[in-house]
Amino acid sequence: MIMVFYADFYPAEKPEEKIFFSEMEMNKNNFNNFVYNVPEISSIRDLCDGSCERFPKNTAFVFRDGDGVREVTYEEVYDDVKAFASYLHSLGLEGKKIAVMGRNCYEWALTYLTVCAGVGVIVPLDKDLSADDIRYLIDDSETAAVVFMEGSEEKLVEIGDGVIKLPASGMEKYIAEGKRLRSEGDRSYENHRVDPHALGILLYTSGTTGVSKGVMLSQNNICSNIVHVARRTAVYPYDRALSVLPLHHTYECMAGFLSFFYAGASIAYNNSLRQLQADFVLFKPTVFVAVPVLLEKLYSMIVKKYAKMKGGKTVLAVQRSLSKLVSKGEARRKIFATVNASLGGRLNRILCGAAALSPEAYHGYESFGYRVYVGYGLTETSPVCIMHHDGYRSADDIGYPLVGVNVKIVDPNSDGVGELAVKGPNVMLGYYKNPQATAEVIRDGWFYTGDLAKRLENGAYKIMGRIKSMIVLENGKKVFPEEIEYYLNENKFVSESFVFGKETDGATVVTASIIPDKEEIDEELKKSGELTDEERENRTKAIITSVVSEVNGKFAAYKAVKKIIIRKSDFIKTTTHKIKRLEEKNKEEE
């Protein structure tokens, strides 16, 4: 997974509130000693009370509302949280599990804060799951109530009458009723006691290789992560995040929501990727939280816009050359003023997670003046455990462990590659109702991630791939698919790739399923004049074969891709755009 934040930001207006990141301590001889002093919190209650009392007049959330834009201050959020808590208590839900499901919006965030800070256990659900899956998860989690957004009604039709259904469209009514109860003396929020170390958040993993499991996190798990990330990467009260990724994933929830709420910053909600460009201009974010596939497509769009301009490629090359001569992000953003304006004019940081970002996109964004920070984590680690920070960034690794988090490489081979294990306050309580699965991954307090990694000479870490996706050849040699995909996806003729071991005549063959970049292929084929469909297909195969041959040259012979599949349809993915490797492998082998 991947993180980003940086303090090189020039505000449009100087904020009235004092920045509470009061001091930076850095030992220049040891990147791992880079820390900020920040307030300690151990629960979402601490987070909610602290931020709402410290930054009452700051904008907490901003979003489209009809034809206009609505802003909600921290003071207003606090009033809504207390009122909604009173309402939920009146339904007998204290200490119960309450699910939240739907698109990113204020009501989703309000439900999360209210349940965690003043009611019970929150269960974020993926709105894109089937009705059967949602029914199963609600039953499995023993959810007592579900707050759902518009568009999710049909998936809840078969949910039993024992589960209270609360459409988010009725939120104004719930809050009004809660305020009435409070006016009569109800103090359910204030009287509720939060145990920071008990189950507080139940998250069902989407998984890329297997069945979903319920990850049990305590509020202290999440809050330790918020604090430890803030110690490495500064977020200020005048910052604004543009939230695009689904909030039910702990990555977006922690990095794109709670971390900004902790700092008194604001969160803007994007309702649709079709509106992404317009939302950049409308909301003017300083930070963009995204995944590689989204960032790479956005970067490709920017470069292609230049290419279509008269002399655009030359202009881009000259601007990049100028950019290399200056180190300050602000100066680089002025050189690329057109790009900067199209992204709202205030963007200076990009948070990228879930997989590795291509070197081309990484260096491209850096040349534009945006600070790109990379990190790693899983739902089970709340989620971040290793990351870049304000003292260190690189395109070649995932950075250093967070303060308070220990990592080790288990059973490394001759190249130093082994399974990454993590120990710290961010490690989950276990898998819900699944002690066997818990025992398989948590041993002696260490969480075994299932990811292969190595420690580099400078002390930073690099992820090599997943153990479950690793290809083991007949001679015992091992191939990491992600390593090959990394270089394939870097080529302009490749939109996306999936590498796996295909069983053929009793042997395992390294196989690459590749989705060509249609625009780049079409542009290349224009050079050959008019072509029949068959000729176009053959030329496309030749181009992709050449790309694979070039990538094969970067590796030892045993790692070379031996079989190529030209893919015409999209890969099966999770809602964070990660390829579901097991499903894809089974599909390709049918």
Regions found by a protein language model. Give the residues of each.
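Conserved AMP-binding/adenylation subdomain of ANL enzymes
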Residues: C223-R240, L247-A337, R346
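ANL superfamily adenylate-forming
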Residues: A7, G151-P196, I302-T338, K568
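Conserved AMP-binding A3 loop
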Residues: E71-E75, G200-I226
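Conserved AMP-binding/adenylate-forming core of the ANL superfamily
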Residues: K57-C105, A109-L113, S130-R135, Q219-N220
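AMP-binding/adenylate-forming catalytic core of the ANL superfamily
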Residues: L129, G424, L429-G430, L452-F555
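Conserved pre-ATP/AMP-binding loop-to-beta segment of ANL
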Residues: P56-T59, R182-Y204, V211, A234-R240
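Conserved AMP-binding/adenylate-forming
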Residues: F288, A331-Y461, I467-M470, S495
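Conserved C-terminal "lid"/linker of ANL adenylate-forming enzymes
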Residues: I471, F498-F500, S546-E590
